[in-house]
Each structure stands twice: as structure tokens, then as C-alpha cells.
Amino acid sequence: MSYYAFEGLIPVVHPDAFVHPSAVLIGDVIVGAGVYIGPLASLRGDYGRLILEAGSNLQDGCIMHGYCDTDTIVHENGHIGHGAILHGCVVGRDALVGMNSVIMDGAVIGEESIVAAMSFVKAGFQGEARQLLVGSPARVLRQVTDQELHWKHLNTKEYQDLAIRCRTGLSETKPLTQAEENRPRLKGTTDVKPKSAQ
């Protein structure tokens, strides 16, 4: 793992969290229990504090950063999709930020809200609970349905379980030169399906 102290501040990582070896954590970063941090994520706590609360996930290629005297926070069970950027913002409990979305300074995503993939949430946006945000700039489309929230919970559970699986089942290796006959398929721990398959 790439952990760097910055001006005396050392990242804090709960022993039950999983941080991929290619992720980078610098300075004032606090990672809670059961958190999953994916490959190539960058958490640059060289100005503001970065906090990932228990059960949250920050997937492949995500960036967290913020200005001095600010906290960038992903609250409990927050779900941050591949390639998203969080800058000086707050993501509420059980909220989901879709792939390649950008959440700007001072923005607050309400608890149990969903930010659609590729959305841009402007600085200072103050969200409420269970909002579906879509577009660039993002606007509130409607309330998140119970079915959508259930789908989000299943996805987050997969990443919470993946943190455990990676701590015990991930190891560096050399590739095979060809696929073996009857190559097994990996399984998740829930019955979650892509939204298009629902």
C-alpha cells in the first residue's frame, strides 16, 4: 500500500478496512471499519481532512481532495462509483455517487440519495434525503424509490463483503498463458443485478 505522512499527519486505516495496494493515501485521511478502497484511488489529505466512515466504499480511480480547514466526508455506507471525484463535499449516509460523477466544494448529498453516473454537482449544492440527482449541472429529478434504495443497499453490501474477501483472497501473482478448461466463475454474495437487468 502507498501511505504517506504529510507534515506529521499519518493516514489512519481501521484494521477491518481494505485498501488496494495501488491506492494512495496521503496525510490527513481517516478510514473506518469495513471500508473498501479500490485500485488506483487517490486520497490526498495534504490540505483538508478526508473521512470514509464505516461500511463505505471508494472504487477504482476515485479521487478525494479538499481545501484547507474543510472535511471531505463519505458517511456510513456511502457508495462512490468508479472514477468519481469528491472535492470538499459531504456524501450522506447510505448515499450513492455514480461512476465518473464530480461533487464540488461545499456540496452536500443527502442521505439515501443517488447521484446518477456522469453527473456534475455544483459547489454549494445543499441536498435533502432520498433525492435522485441527474445531469451536468445536476438537478433533482425525483425522489429515490424503495426499489432503487434496495438495489443500492445490495451493491454496498457486495463491497462490504468484498473488503473481507480481498483481505483473505487477494494476492499478487503471475498470469497464466491461456485460460484453463472449465475455468470457474466468481460469484458475489448477494443477488444484485445491473439496473438494466431489473
Swiss-Prot record:
A GO molecular-function annotation: transferase activity
Keyword Transferase among record annotations: yes
Region span, Disordered: 174-198
Pathway annotation from the record: Amine and polyamine metabolism; carnitine metabolism
Residues in coiled coil: none
Keywords in alphabetical order: Repeat, Transferase
PANTHER family membership: DYNACTIN SUBUNIT P25, GAMMA CARBONIC ANHYDRASE-LIKE 1, MITOCHONDRIAL-RELATED
Name of the protein: Carnitine operon protein CaiE
Species for this entry: Salmonella typhimurium (strain LT2 / SGSC1412 / ATCC 700720)
